[in-house]
C-alpha cells in the first residue's frame, strides 16, 4: 500500500524493542512490499516473534476480525472496516494523501476513542514501541477502544447513500420539470 515501506522499517523494530515477555505474546500479521519481505521476516525471526508476512492477504476481513490491535493507514475503507468489526487501531495517515483526507478519516475513530492517531512524522521506533507496551499491559484500553470503534460503525451506509442520491435526483428532476 501507499507508504508501506515506512511500516516495514518501523513496526518490526518497534516490536523488537518491546520487553521479551511482551514479545512472546505477539502474533503478527504484516502486509509488506515485496522488496521488504526478507528484511521484515529476518527481524521477526531474530526476535522470535511469531509472524506471518505477505505482499497481500486475500482473507483480510477474517484477519481484522481476529486481531486484538491493528496498525494501519487510514483510508476510508480501512476505517469503515475497523469500525464494522470493532477493532482498536493505531492509525497512521498517509502524509501525502490528497487534502490530508486520511487524517480526517482517522479522526472519526480517534475522536470517539476507538483509535490512536499517530501522524507519520511521529512514527518512529521509540514512540510506537512505547505505545504498544502501554496497550499490551492495559487490556482495558484495547477493550474500551474496540467498543468505541464499533460504536462508529454505520452498517446501513450504502443504503443511506443510495436513498440520499435518489432524493437528490428526484428533487433535481422535479426542479427541471417546474422550469
Model-derived features: positions:
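Donor-nucleotide binding loops and adjacent catalytic segments primarily
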Residues: 1-70, 103-107, 111, 118-127
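Short glycine-/small-residue-rich Rossmann-like dinucleotide-binding loops
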Residues: 33, 74-76, 93
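Short alpha-helical segment that forms part of, or immediately flanks, the ligand-binding pocket
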Residues: 61, 79-87, 107
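Acidic donor-binding loop of glycosyltransferase active sites
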Residues: 65-79, 87-88
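Short hydrophobic beta-strand element within catalytic cores of glycosyltransferases
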Residues: 72, 88-99
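C-terminal "capping" alpha-helix adjacent to the active site of nucleotide-linked donor transferases
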Residues: 116-119, 123-140
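A short, well-ordered alpha-helix in the C-terminal region of glycosyltransferases
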Residues: 141-155
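C-terminal alpha-helical cap of glycosyltransferases
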Residues: 154-179
Amino acid at each position: 500500500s501507499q507508504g508501506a515501506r515506512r511500516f516495514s522499517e518501523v513496526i518490526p523494530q518497534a516490536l523488537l524493542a518491546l520487553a521479551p515477555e511482551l514479545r512472546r505474546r505477539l502474533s503478527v500479521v504484516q502486509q509488506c512490499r515485496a522488496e521488504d519481505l526478507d528484511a521484515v521476516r529476518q527481524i521477526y525471526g531474530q526476535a522470535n516473534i511469531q509472524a506471518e508476512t505477505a505482499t497481500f492477504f486475500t482473507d483480510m476481513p477474517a484477519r481484522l476480525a481476529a486481531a486484538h490491535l491493528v496498525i494501519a493507514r487510514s483510508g476510508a475503507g480501512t476505517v469503515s472496516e475497523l469500525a464494522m468489526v470493532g477493532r482498536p487501531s493505531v492509525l497512521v495517515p498517509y502524509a501525502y494523501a490528497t487534502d490530508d483526507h486520511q487524517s480526517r478519516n482517522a479522526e472519526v475513530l480517534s475522536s470517539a476513542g476507538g483509535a490512536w492517531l499517530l501522524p507519520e512524522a511521529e512514527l518512529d521506533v521509540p514512540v510506537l514501541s512505547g505505545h504498544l507496551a502501554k496497550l499490551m499491559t492495559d487490556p482495558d484500553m484495547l477493550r474500551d477502544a474496540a467498543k468505541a470503534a464499533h460504536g462508529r460503525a454505520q452498517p446501513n451506509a450504502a443504503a443511506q447513500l443510495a436513498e440520499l442520491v435518489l432524493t437528490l435526483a428526484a428533487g433535481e428532476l422535479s426542479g427541471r420539470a417546474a422550469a
